[in-house]
Amino acid sequence: MFKPNALFLTDGYKIGHKAMLAPGTTKLYGTWIPRSVKYAPKNIIKIVSFGQQMTWRWLHDEFEENFFKQPREVATQFGNDMSAYLGLQYDASHFEALHNLGYLPLKVKSLPEGIETAPNIPHMTFINTVDGFAWLTLYLETIVSSLAWKPSTSATLALQYRRRADLWVKNTDPSSMWLVPFMCHDFSARGLNPHDMISSGLGHATSFRGSDSIITIPAARYYYGETDVCINSVNASEHSVSTTKIFTVGEQQMLSDWMKTFPTGILSVVSDTFDLWQLITQYLPALKDEIMARDGKLVIRPDSGDPVDIICGIDDYIQNDDGTLYSVRYTSGMFRDRNKKITVSEQKGVIELLWDIFGGTTNEQGYKVLDPHIGAIYGDSITIDRQVEIYERLAAKGFAATNIVLGVGSYTYQYNTRDTFGFAAKGAWF
């Protein structure tokens, strides 16, 4: 297994910085700061402080295993490699001195994790505690930066989803606020590298319990001392297993079989392997008695198309005298022409169709809530803006926000950089 000397976890230009320090420099004070929301999603003005404990625990472990526990020759060999790298003789005595010391002589301070700050407020500081190691403080800038920006960024984005879910559930189904921690489910693992699976998964878990990033469970235990399982999920199908059943017993029988395999609890079924609308309008009515008799909820999961229209239906349409429906295309806010022919199912959308079949209740706020034996989740192309649009469109049709669970994927948690919130580790005092 590739386990390089931990000294390699830096930028090449750091190698010469010890010799560039002013003579007599004994201490160097570093800061970790989100400096800007210029490139952040709109309306985000604060950043969540998160990930510092994980960052320094990981860094400690890395240096312990791949530097301090190794023979002293690893420091000498690193110096030889740097001589070849720079094309001149390199003095590695300070790395040898660090190895002799046996630990990273740093004092780290951090804001409490989970609080929000405006930009330009340091989330953590670090300073060398032993004279002669001022060079070490920002030698670690590279690895601290690469470790720390992702968990804070993901926690900040997760909080935006949480606040919007809180608001819409409070307005449309306040007696079900307990559902909010499960209304945005982490689907992002497959779009992230293994370390980001951990850091981003933990970031999501600061606001939600719903997650398929199961690496979050041991990571929370190790880095944060979480004794309980901090996330939850359900039995759920994917297209591959659906296809094996559809081609052998048919889709309707597939649903019936799976409800027998999983007779209790929530069962999520990917529903557009072939035809979403056929599954909803033909197979679900045929299986209604089984679904309603089951001790749990069957969750329908569309997996393609415009999530807003699939969930909520198409609200911009016209109907010909013969009953044919067409979606409407607009240009610059003005009606232009018919766009394409649509079905009644497409016009209604998943939630209304499920209501037509299974019904439910109307709560005190006047919003419809699906029968607890049926539900829906959508986990493709979800963004913060689409989350709000889905809640708005459902409310306009008289449905509570609690009728839908959203899968938040790698677009949300991967489509970011260190510059999203302007994170930087910099020296501030010597």
Feature-to-residue mapping (PLM):
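Low-complexity, highly charged intrinsically disordered N-terminal segments
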Residues: Y29-Y90
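Beta-strand segments within the central parallel beta-sheet cores of soluble alpha/beta enzyme folds
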Residues: V299-R301, G375, N403-G407
